Every structure is written in C-alpha cells, then in structure tokens.
C-alpha cells in the first residue's frame, strides 16, 4: 500500500453534501478553507447568518466621529472560539492582514478594519464571522473519503451574496448537482 497523495485545499470552498450531514452546524454549510496542511485544516463557515451587531459596541470603538450604530451581519464560522472575530473580505483592503490569498480574498482580525468599515473606508465586500472550524491531521481527508464534502473553487459571488440561505443551493447548482437527485446512499466506486 502506497502513501496517499496530499491535496492542499487552502483557498477552496467545501460544500456539505445533502443527506449526509443532516443536522447541526455543518448541515448545508459552505466553508472557506483558510489553511490546509498535513498538520490539519482551518476554515470559516460563511453561510450561517446568526444576527446583526453594532461594530462600534462589539469592538468597543472609542471614536466620537462615529455617532450612530454601524450594524453588520454576523456569521457563525464554526464551533471553535466564538469570542474570536474575523473579517473575510475582498483583497482591495490590505491593511494588517491576517491572511492574504491569491484569489482576491483576505482575512483580517483587528480593530483597524472595523473602524475603517464604520467610516466607509473598508473593503468593498466583507463578512464578519465569529468562530471557526478546524480538523486534526487526516480528519478532513477522512471526511472527504466518506463523501461528507464536495470541493469547489472559491467563488466570491457565493461568499458575498446577499441571501445566505440560498448560498448552499446555488453552490450545488454551480457544481451541476440537483439536491433532489443526490443519493442518500454514499460510497466510492
């Protein structure tokens, strides 16, 4: 038996398969993969809208120039560390980036971006996401072998689409899959 070939999925999108992941946080989830190495993987769910928050209050922005609340949608990125907030955003904003991708996306997690968004000087597109998803070494590969996830290239239109409820269905359509015809029986040929 030979060694398995590692396929790096950083910058890709995971699409939860229908009828396999049937409940919980991963049901019909789309996950943007921040990092995927042989040591594990980290991603952000980007279609779990949970509420709207005031950036000024959340980040405790002390700036007298911001007089009204700056309400933004808040997404649940995964079950780990909900006290951590991230901005998944377009790469037109490049101050103090946490991660910079070559597919026109970046991730920031600092006070400066929240202030810039509040002043209208932030990125053209952004999602505020709390928490993240992580896999131990080999765990994601095992889930992929069990067909729990489909993999698609990053598509900014899906990530920043206005209607989070339709993102998953639109991703399936993009992959040429009709949920109705997706088998609840899984396996590899």
From Swiss-Prot:
NCBIfam families: PRK00228.1-4 (NF001268). InterPro entries: AlgH-like (IPR003774). GO terms for cellular component: cytosol. Coiled coil: none annotated. Belongs to the UPF0301 (AlgH) family. This is UPF0301 protein RMA_0049. It comes from Rickettsia massiliae (strain Mtu5). SUPFAM superfamilies: VC0467-like (SSF143456).
